[in-house]
Amino acid sequence: MPDAFAAADQTLDARGLRCPEPVMMVRKAVRHMADGQTLLIISDDPATTRDIPGFCQFMEHTLLAQATEQLPYRYLLRKGRAAA
Protein backbone atom coordinates (compact mmCIF):
# COMPACT_ATOMS: atom_id res chain seq x y z
CA MET A 1 0.00 0.00 0.00
CA PRO A 2 1.58 3.31 -1.04
CA ASP A 3 2.25 5.94 1.62
CA ALA A 4 0.07 8.94 0.72
CA PHE A 5 2.30 11.17 2.83
CA ALA A 6 5.61 10.25 1.14
CA ALA A 7 5.26 12.48 -1.93
CA ALA A 8 4.44 15.78 -0.20
CA ASP A 9 5.96 18.87 -1.80
CA GLN A 10 6.75 20.39 1.60
CA THR A 11 6.83 19.25 5.23
CA LEU A 12 5.93 21.19 8.36
CA ASP A 13 7.02 19.65 11.66
CA ALA A 14 4.87 21.21 14.39
CA ARG A 15 5.67 18.67 17.12
CA GLY A 16 5.91 20.24 20.56
CA LEU A 17 3.70 23.19 19.62
CA ARG A 18 0.25 23.73 21.06
CA CYS A 19 -2.90 25.40 19.77
CA PRO A 20 -3.00 27.85 18.06
CA GLU A 21 0.63 27.62 16.90
CA PRO A 22 0.34 24.60 14.55
CA VAL A 23 -2.50 26.15 12.54
CA MET A 24 -0.73 29.52 12.43
CA MET A 25 2.36 27.79 11.02
CA VAL A 26 0.25 25.90 8.47
CA ARG A 27 -1.36 29.14 7.35
CA LYS A 28 2.04 30.80 6.91
CA ALA A 29 3.45 27.81 4.99
CA VAL A 30 0.44 27.57 2.67
CA ARG A 31 0.66 31.28 1.81
CA HIS A 32 4.07 30.62 0.23
CA MET A 33 2.94 27.57 -1.77
CA ALA A 34 1.59 27.42 -5.32
CA ASP A 35 -1.97 26.18 -5.90
CA GLY A 36 -1.99 22.40 -6.12
CA GLN A 37 1.15 21.87 -4.03
CA THR A 38 0.95 19.56 -1.02
CA LEU A 39 2.04 20.03 2.58
CA LEU A 40 2.71 17.24 5.06
CA ILE A 41 1.91 18.43 8.58
CA ILE A 42 3.32 16.48 11.53
CA SER A 43 1.95 17.33 14.98
CA ASP A 44 1.45 15.89 18.44
CA ASP A 45 -1.17 18.43 19.53
CA PRO A 46 -4.56 16.72 20.04
CA ALA A 47 -6.32 19.95 19.00
CA THR A 48 -5.02 19.50 15.44
CA THR A 49 -7.46 16.62 14.93
CA ARG A 50 -10.16 19.29 14.91
CA ASP A 51 -8.19 22.36 13.83
CA ILE A 52 -6.49 21.08 10.65
CA PRO A 53 -9.69 19.74 9.01
CA GLY A 54 -11.50 22.94 10.06
CA PHE A 55 -8.72 25.11 8.63
CA CYS A 56 -8.85 23.25 5.32
CA GLN A 57 -12.61 23.64 5.05
CA PHE A 58 -12.62 27.32 6.05
CA MET A 59 -9.69 28.28 3.78
CA GLU A 60 -10.91 26.06 0.91
CA HIS A 61 -7.93 23.73 0.80
CA THR A 62 -8.18 19.96 0.33
CA LEU A 63 -7.32 17.55 3.14
CA LEU A 64 -6.06 14.58 1.11
CA ALA A 65 -5.21 12.27 4.01
CA GLN A 66 -4.92 12.17 7.77
CA ALA A 67 -3.46 9.65 10.20
CA THR A 68 -4.59 10.35 13.75
CA GLU A 69 -4.63 6.87 15.28
CA GLN A 70 -1.23 7.35 16.95
CA LEU A 71 1.34 10.06 17.60
CA PRO A 72 2.63 11.91 15.78
CA TYR A 73 -0.47 12.86 13.83
CA ARG A 74 0.02 13.38 10.10
CA TYR A 75 -2.06 15.40 7.67
CA LEU A 76 -1.65 15.90 3.93
CA LEU A 77 -3.09 19.16 2.66
CA ARG A 78 -3.32 20.33 -0.95
CA LYS A 79 -3.49 24.08 -1.47
CA GLY A 80 -6.80 24.95 -3.09
CA ARG A 81 -9.69 22.74 -4.14
CA ALA A 82 -9.58 19.98 -6.73
CA ALA A 83 -10.73 21.03 -10.19
CA ALA A 84 -14.32 19.99 -10.82
From Swiss-Prot:
InterPro entries: Sulphur_carrier_TusA, TusA-like, TusA-like_sf. It comes from the Bacteria. The active site is at C19. The keyword Metal-binding does not apply. One of its GO terms (biological process) is tRNA wobble position uridine thiolation. It is found in: Cytoplasm. The keyword Disulfide bond does not apply. Keywords: Cytoplasm, tRNA processing. Signal peptide: none annotated. SUPFAM superfamilies: SirA-like. Its main location: cytoplasm. GO terms for molecular function: sulfur carrier activity. Pathway: tRNA modification. GO terms for cellular component: cytoplasm. Coiled coil: none annotated. NCBIfam families: PRK00299.1. HAMAP family: Thiourid_synth_A. Interacts with IscS. This is Sulfur carrier protein TusA. It comes from Sodalis glossinidius (strain morsitans). The gene is tusA.
